[in-house]
Amino acid sequence: MANAEVSVPVGDVVVVPTEGNEGENPEDTKTQVILQLQPVQQGIYEAGSENNTAVVAVETHTIHKIEEGIDASTIEANEDMEIAYPITCGESKAILLWKKFVCPGINVKCVKFNDQLISPKHFVHLAGKSTLKDWKRAIRLGGIMLRKMMDSGQIDFYQHDKVCSNTCRSTKFDLLISSARAPVPGQQTSVVQTPTSADGSITQIAISEESMEEAGLEWNSALTAAVTMATEEGVKKDSEEISQDTLMFWKGIADVGLMEEVVCNIQKEIEELLRGVQQRLIQAPFQVTDAAVLNNVAHTFGLMDTVKKVLDNRKNQVEQGEEQFLYTLTDLERQLEEQKKQAQDHRLKSQTVQNVVLMPVSTPKPPKRPRLQRPASTTVLSPSPPVHQPQFTVISPITITPVGQSFSMGNIPVATLSQGSSPVTVHTLPSGPQLFRYATVVSSAKSSSPDTVTIHPSSSLALLSSTAMQDGSTLGNMTTMVSPVELVAMESGLTSAIQAVESTSEDGQTIIEIDPAPDPEAEDTEGKAVILETELRTEEKVVAEMEEHQHQVHNVEIVVLED
């Protein structure tokens, strides 16, 4: 290519003198040749190129001399000639100096615009196309995008095989896996028809349309199997579509005994590739290059179904775990509700017990008045119903002590008690306004045996037995048996009065203490003590006058219960 001839129309060659001294030899003056590209159908691109673009196969050359007699159709060029391409971006026009157009080119000052040398990125910005991320798509050569021409191989960076930043998309299509560069998933790609391989099939190589110069990614040559290889039918892998040459090629490898070695090498390469992806995934976040490698390997070897199967298995496991989690959560909620209910019941029971404990104890009812009870030996005689209660009249004189008040004795019941210790004969008395509550029989102080009987509480004497009196002599006989009696009616607390009366009484006297029951008519006289003194002497006779006497109680034991 050093002495290649460029065949272009005469009017399409523009010679631009470069900066130099005017006095120098014109033959040594460097010139710039601006090539107007024309459609060329040539060589191996005839089968796949239908875009009518020209193939540039020119390096930097210098015209040795230009003479008037030399035909312009044949220009001999050398390395001193500088080639420039007219480019456009929107409405702006500039010249791309190819010798300065080195990889990666985005920030390299290789565009001459308004007599200024600027970078392609700056040129796109001045042209108002800065919104486009890919500067190669914004710049056009002869109406064709610069990227498309570079992908098709019509133009490339200057000395790209020697100077490469590894941040570009190489347009040198090396079919060797070690030198292949992987595209980034998700970017627009264009399919470029490459030369026919040895087996006669046409290989499609997916080239990304998105530039990676700005991203600054460094593509490692170890990322093998990054280029998706397919037949012209796409991803069909049926053995029927394999050409005869390909079949013979692999059959020859098997015949010479290299198949095992080839398979082992391929396996090692793939394992190293995947191992590198795993190591990078541990050390750093997942990168775009790793995603590209995995995607290409999966598609190349048809492993997408395996990947989907793994995803389905994980999805099923997650769903089962979610169901188990929901079941456990429901069971825990149920247990929580039961515990809350039990705690509430326990709290109610505790409150009830506390209320019972703190409840004030009710005061016991006052004891009832003791009742007279008859012993088992007591003989109860069933009396005939009396027509009238017997009336007894005391004929003997009754004297009243000064401390008392005089009152009528007509309605006072009188009891004739025996002085003996036991039994005591009690005659029935008529009911009246005053009832005996307490009766005390006090014997003489000189008596050897105590003859004191206390009858209480405040209840009238019960009639235990009664017998009809035969005649009045019985009452007289009983009267003769009674020693002089003093009747004392007093309230509780006046015990001293009883003692005084007892001390002043004569020998053989009997004192009866009478506490009358409450009388509504006698409320105004409450609190007054009345002492009734009756002296019954042995020589006096008591005559009992009664209209009817049918009942009599004698020889009766009186049992008194105290509180």
From Swiss-Prot:
InterPro entries according to UniProt: SAND-like_dom_sf, SAND_dom
PROSITE patterns: SAND
Binding site for DNA: 129, 133, 136, 147
Binding site for Zn(2+): 103, 160, 164, 168
Modification type N-acetylalanine: residues: 2
Disordered: annotated span: 360-385
Keyword Protease belongs to the record: no
Any one Gene Ontology BP term: regulation of transcription by RNA polymerase II
Name of the molecule in the record: Glucocorticoid modulatory element-binding protein 1
The organism of origin for this protein: Bos taurus (Bovine)
Classification lineage: Eukaryota, Metazoa, Chordata, Craniata, Vertebrata
